[in-house]
Amino acid sequence: MDHNDHVNLLRPANLNQGGVYADLGAGNGAFTLALRELVGLDATIYAVDRDRSSLNELDAVHRARFNTSRNLIPLNKDFSHPLDIPLLDGVVMANSLHFFKDKEKILRHVHGFLKPNSALIIIEYNVDSGNMWVPHPLTFETYCALAPRAGFSEPRLLARVPSRFLKEFYSAVAFTM
C-alpha cells in the first residue's frame, strides 16, 4: 500500500477538519500522515506507539511533509493501558487490533478515549485466521458482531484494498453510542 491507499481507506469516514484524534499503534505513521491530510494542520493528533524509533521517524517525516510538527504529539506508550490524553473526536487503529486476542476488551478500553458520537476507524486484514505476524485478524463480518458489544454502533464498511499477504485490507467506521 502507498500513501494514496492509506488516505483512500480513511477518506470515506468524512472526518471533520480540526479536532483531536489519535492513531493507536501508529508505528512509523503511514496512517497518521493520511489522517493529517484529511483533518488538517489545526487538528491535534496523538500518535501512540511502544516503539520510540518509529515515532521519531514519524516526527521527521511529518516535519518534512507538512513543514511542521505542530499539533502532532508522539506518545511512546502502550495504548492498551491508560493514557493521559483528552477525550478524542476520533481514533484510527490500523493493523493494531489484530495483536489482541480479546478484542472486545480492547475496544471497550478504546471507547473510553472517545467523546460521544465519535468515530473509531479500523483498518484490518479481512480474514479470521492469522499467522505469526498477524496473530488475531478479524473479518468485517466478525467486526460487525463485535463492535456493538463494545459500545459502538454497527460498523460501516468504508473501503477495501488488495493485500499480497492475507487477501485484502478493509477499513470500517463505527461510532460511540
Where are these regions (language model features)?
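Core SAM-dependent methyltransferase catalytic element
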Residues: V161-M177
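Short alpha-helix
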Residues: H136-G151
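A short SAM/SAH-binding and catalytic strip from SAM-dependent methyltransferases
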Residues: D89-K103
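Conserved beta-strand signature within the Rossmann-like core of class I S-adenosyl-L-methionine
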Residues: N117-Y125
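A short glycine-rich, Lys/Arg-flanked "PGG" loop and its adjoining helix->strand segment in the class I
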Residues: E104-P116
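Class I SAM-dependent methyltransferase SAM/SAH-binding core
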Residues: A22, G27-H81
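Conserved alpha-helix/loop element of class I SAM-dependent methyltransferases that forms part
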Residues: M1-G19, A34
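A short acidic, Gly/Pro-enriched loop at the edge of an enzyme's catalytic core
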Residues: S80-V91
